[in-house]
Structure formats: C-alpha cells, structure tokens
Amino acid sequence: MELVAGCYEQVLFGFAVHPEPKASGDHEKWTPVADFTHHAHTASLSAVAVNSRFVVTGSKDETIHIYDMKKKIDHGALVHHNGTITCLKFYGNRHLISGAEDGLICVWDAKKWECLKSIKAHKGHVTSLSIHPSGKLALSVGTDKTLRTWNLVEGRSAFIKNIKQNAHIVEWSPRGERYVVVILNKIDVYQLDTASVSGTITNGKRISSVTFLSESVLAVAGDEEVVRVFDCDSLVCLSEFKAHENRVKDLFSFETPEHHVIVTASSDGFIKMWKLHEDKKVSPCLLCEVNTNARLTCLGVWLDRATDTRESPPPDAETPPVSKEEPSKSNKKESGDEVQEGERQSKPGTKKCGSTGNGDKPAKGNSLVSAKKRKMVEMLGKKGNSLVTAKKRKMVEMLEKKKRKKKKM
C-alpha cells in the first residue's frame, strides 16, 4: 500500500506504509517509508487518481501524467485539455475520465491511453465529476451552475439540472442510491430514485473534500483543521476530530479486513492515516503520519491489488462505457430546471490529443491520427480488393474471348 499526494511544488510523493507486527487494537501503528518522488509537471498538481497499476496526476500545466506504480517509471502524458485539470476518476482498470477548466470531459482507454470520447460538458469549468458504481452513469458540476447526468454507455448527456450556485464537489455513495452536491460550506443530499434533495448538511467553513464511509455516513473536510462525520439520513454530525494544524485539503477512505481507514492530507505538509471505529461517534486512532514539507493539494491511495472493490466494475458492467461512435445531434426538451438532451461531441482543439511518453513502451499516438491511419488502411484495403477484382474480370473476359474464337473455328 502506498500513500500518494500532489503539491503546489509540482511533485508527486509516494510513501509505502506497513503495519507494525507487534502493535494491535488501539495500539496499532503503521510505518511510512519514502518510496518515490515524481516531478513531471511544470505547474502545481490539482488532481490525482489511482487504479491497480497506475497513478495519474492532473495539473495547472493542462496535462495528465501517468506513473507506473509497478515499475516506478513515468509512462507518458495525456495532452488533450486546454485548461487546468480539475478532476480525474478511474473506472476499474479500463477507463479514466478527466475534467478540466476548458469545460471538457474526456473518456480515456486506460490500456492504450487513447481518447475515446471528448464532450463539451459545461459552458464554464468542470469542477468535479463522479462515476456511478455501475459504470453506466456519471455526474458532473461546473461553473455554469448546472448539475449534469451523463450516459456513459452511449457517451452523451442525459439530464441537466440547474442549481442556484456553482457547485465544486459531487460524489456518489458506495451503492449509488444517493449522491451529494457541495456548494461552499453546504452539502445537498440527493436521492437517486427521486433526483431531489432529501436534506442539507452545513459545515463550519468551505468544504474542500468529502468521502463516503458507508451508504449513509459521510466524512467532510474543509478550510479548517477539523474532519467531521455526518449521517446523511438524520443530517446530524456524529463526531469530529482535529486532524491537522492547518486546513485539510483532501480525504481518501478505504476498508481493510480489520477496519475502515481514512487518510487526510493538509496544507501543513502532513499525510495522516486514521483507523475508524465501528461506532462513528468515537474519535479515530492515528495509525501513522508523514511530513512532506510541501503544500499538499491532492491525495490518493494505491492499494497494490488487482481489484479494488470500490472501483472495479461488476461482472455485468465489463463492456466499455463508450465507443468511438459519431456524436448524436442535440435534442433538448426543457422542463422546469431539468433538461434531457443528447450532447454533441466536441471537436478537439488544435492543441493536442492522445498520449506522449518515454516509458518502456512506445508512446501511444494521437488518437485522431490513429483513426485517420485506420481509415486510410481500410481505404487501401478496399482499393486493393477492387484491383484484384478488375484483374479477375479481365482474365475472365480473355478466357471468354478465346472460347468464342474456338467455337467459330
């Protein structure tokens, strides 16, 4: 297991953590060991995502860098966006979805690192996105004061909900029965079956990160040193604890066979691991901490296993979420503050698309160029067939002429 964190200083940190064998129960401790630093970006890191093989980072330099956790090498960069990368989400090990300040949401093949789909998702920035556990839906919010639902099977917009303010976080619950939308210091809890707000949670200060601990329990961090745990049904704060000496920038949670773990990163430079108790009203125990001496911005945990139960697709969702089909024409029908539509696929800008890299494998080419090459190959194949057919026809005609001459003789 490794804790990975990005910072303003353009570096990705990696720390391997191991449980101390003699400690257990409330005295359980883990030991962090510095494993790597990766300086690939030319501006501060803004987002990080992890699957079983790779860590990807987004930056204000408008690129997404890929780091191979197995080989501990740079695997290249994805260069399609024209703006700060604001959010990155893996769906299992096959797909990565990115959002940026250019308003685009891109779906990437996480094997070939090709851009499968590029959608103009918001009129302003894309500020956050979240993938439903089924892999068939995604939610996004942006600076155009909209909450958008995406059909990932067809690669198009399904619904648009107008909200009164710009939201900066959206997150599905583990089973996908509810989701939360964060605006400043308020959390609106939505039910999937009604698509309406069932309640609102208010935090002390602006919220920077949320993570579901269960279907109804949500951990919340903001522009303060405290982490709070809320019940999404009763909207009550179950507990709170001081996690850092400065504001908490990001949260990440996962389960081990023994207990639930929450990881926090702060602008004070510390990454900390906490063991949560079954009774969420009891404050968690600190498992380990490490000081990066940097201003941390984003956080992830690499679990070093083939399947992560929170991110791997269920058996019936193994098909790719989108294919390289033609964009559907816009067909909008407005009803109140909700719109159902088929979204046009955006045309990639003149800047860039696809992957460039210096890993052990050759860098994957521009996905658009690849498509052109495939088309050319198909066209050449067709021409070749037509030439062969013409030759065959000519030979048949010559044979028929010879037969006619023999008959006349």
Task: Map each language-model feature to its residues.
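Short coil/turn segments within WD40 beta-propeller repeats
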Residues: 9-13, 43-46, 61-65, 73, ...
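Short C-terminal beta-strands that terminate individual repeats in beta-propeller domains
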Residues: 25-28, 35-40, 74-80, 115-121, ...
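Solenoidal tandem-repeat scaffolds enriched in leucines and small polar residues
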Residues: 114-204
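Terminal intrinsically disordered, low-complexity extensions flanking WD-repeat/beta-propeller proteins
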Residues: 1, 11, 20-24, 44, ...
